[in-house]
Amino acid sequence: MPIEFIATSKLPTAFGEFNISVFQDPVTGEEHVALSKGLENPPTDPVLVRVHSECLTGDAFASLKCDCGPQLQATQKLINEAGQGVILYLRQEGRGIGLTNKIRAYALQDQGHDTVDANLLLNLPADARRYDMCSIMLDHLKVKEVKLITNNPLKIQALKDQGINVVDRVPLTVGRNPFNEQYLKTKRERMAHLYQKDDF
């Protein structure tokens, strides 16, 4: 996807000061964000990176149905403590199916279906996300080698397929609560996420 760098600014946050950069698809107008720290000069060592898909309910409204909000906040803390890193915040709500369909899927989950089956019952893929914009964003930041903060092996492979050297995986297990235990188990059992059994 031919996204283009548009704008950048400093962004003070509750977790430290970052730089926020916006990238845009010139055809669709879709915007993605890189939240970075300590990358004023090209890095010489592998950089902490998280690829985080937009989750309005979790990131903005602190929903307990997922672990997205806690993952985002934990990553900001981790990067701030390390002094260097980047969050690629991709505008792919609901694993790429959009907000409306995500809420429809939530309604099916309320009836007892898991997160995978809920999407399939709506004739939608379990995961419709794309990651082809990541290499362009990381290249703009001069990041060539990454320590990927993820539990999702698909993200690791997606970055490798784009020529990004993923030298390590940093597990991220936060945000478990009674409302999302089944969701997390489904991600491990049906979506191959790299949680450990004792995480649950």
Curated annotation (Swiss-Prot):
Pathway: Cofactor biosynthesis; riboflavin biosynthesis; 5-amino-6-(D-ribitylamino)uracil from GTP: step 1/4. The keyword Iron does not apply. GTP binds at residues 50-54, 71, 93-95, 115, 150, 155. Keywords: GTP-binding, Hydrolase, Metal-binding, Nucleotide-binding, Riboflavin biosynthesis, Zinc. The active site is at residues 127, 129. Zn(2+) binds at residues 55, 66, 68. It holds the Pfam family GTP_cyclohydro2. It catalyses: GTP + 4 H2O = 2,5-diamino-6-hydroxy-4-(5-phosphoribosylamino)-pyrimidine + formate + 2 phosphate + 3 H(+). Binds 1 zinc ion per subunit. Its cofactor is Zn(2+). GO terms for molecular function: GTP binding; GTP cyclohydrolase II activity; zinc ion binding. Its EC number is 3.5.4.25. The keyword Cell wall biogenesis/degradation does not apply. Catalyzes the conversion of GTP to 2,5-diamino-6-ribosylamino-4(3H)-pyrimidinone 5'-phosphate (DARP), formate and pyrophosphate. HAMAP family: RibA. Belongs to the GTP cyclohydrolase II family. This is GTP cyclohydrolase-2.
